[in-house]
């Protein structure tokens, strides 16, 4: 990945984290995930980013497409998957879920954000997509046959 792409990823993840911190500052912990999601959408729109909410992800199983096998909470600028949680602590399954979404979307980075903490900075995990994307399971490749990993 080019340095410019890494910088763009840092800018995008920075905007998402800033939005999350603002939402958490205003609302605090204790609400349902749906409330934080709605407020994150409002906040991210003010940060001038493209967002897809509850994006359906298809899965190919034995040559059969399951159109809405999964739903991400947010995909930001086509390159960052954001999963919101309201849990006492992250579990391994939360990271596994995000890694699956990264694999299926081809996005290079994801953020787990747990709003059930006193300070959101303690409830954020950045997860990198280090897995290869099986053919037919994610976004189509770019013009050179490589998986799409850049922003935008």
Question: Where on the chain are the PLM-derived regions?
Answer:
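Interdomain/boundary linker segments immediately adjacent to catalytic/signaling cores
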Residues: 1-26
């Amino acid at each position: 990945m080019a340095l410019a792409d890494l910088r763009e990823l840092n800018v995008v993840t920075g905007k998402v984290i800033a939005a999350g911190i603002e939402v958490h500052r205003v609302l605090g912990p204790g609400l349902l995930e749906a409330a934080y999601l709605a407020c994150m959408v409002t906040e991210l729109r003010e940060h001038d980013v493209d967002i897809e909410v509850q994006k359906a992800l298809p899965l190919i199983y034995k040559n059969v497409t399951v159109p809405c096998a999964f739903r991400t909470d947010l995909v930001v600028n086509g390159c960052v998957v954001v999963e919101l949680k309201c849990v006492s602590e992250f579990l391994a399954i939360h990271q596994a879920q995000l890694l699956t979404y990264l694999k299926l979307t081809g996005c290079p980075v994801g953020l787990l954000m747990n709003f059930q903490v006193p300070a959101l900075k303690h409830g954020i995990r950045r997860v990198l997509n280090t897995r290869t994307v099986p053919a037919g399971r994610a976004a189509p490749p770019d013009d050179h046959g490589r998986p799409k990993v850049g922003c935008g």
